[in-house]
Amino acid sequence: MLRNRFAASSWSTTSGLLFRDAKDAFDHILLGAPDLDRGVGWIEERTGVRAQFGGNHPGRGTRNALLSLGTGHYLEIIAPDPAQPNVPDERGLGRLPSPRIIQWAVHSDDIAATKRMAEAAGIKTIGPQPGSRQRPDGKMLRWQALGIEQTTPLVPFFIQWQKGAPHPSSDAPELGSVKSLRFETPQPDELRRILRGAAVEADIRKTNLPRIVLTVQTARGEVEMS
């Protein structure tokens, strides 16, 4: 049974605030790749599941392929879009030596409220800003994204999907369910402070190099990626 991000077990209370565990709060995990086919093949080789082409991000210079991680959660394989060669590669995807997890997004039902909560906790935000993706069927999927000042590695952004729009997890091939989501960073206290300011708890560990570690229960067994 796949995990639903709204399950009651995903919530805890601390000092009167309602906290979500990152494993339930995340909307999607971004796996960066220098080439989309290479990223799709990298996942398929490890899991036996082939991602579905998601579409292009107009003006962003990227395109993606998707895999569902349960209701309200998905893995996004993102890579440069050859059809947009003049758009700067802001994430440095084309320079990646191999596919790896580069970012994560947290779901918000009210992006304005998320912004107010974060700023009340002393966290600087960017936006919200509109985003869009053109699906293969020609339909445009739209959202609002709220950025957080990157004072430490692994800080997420927050996303609110346009009302009535189908969530990308709803029609993407099923990869499996999330067993664990871990964050390794040289600055665990700073990352923890930022996440708690947005009412998110996470498994954060101190290491020399920052990375996001996702473990998925697939038909082939547990698969770890970072």
Where are these regions (language model features)?
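N-terminal export signals
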Residues: 1-18
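Glycine-centered flexibility motif
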Residues: 3, 54-55, 61, 219-221
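Glyoxalase I/VOC metalloenzyme domain signal
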Residues: 19-26, 31-52, 69-226
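A short beta-turn/loop motif at secondary-structure boundaries
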Residues: 57-60, 133-135
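N-terminal low-complexity or amphipathic/hydrophobic leaders
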Residues: 60-71
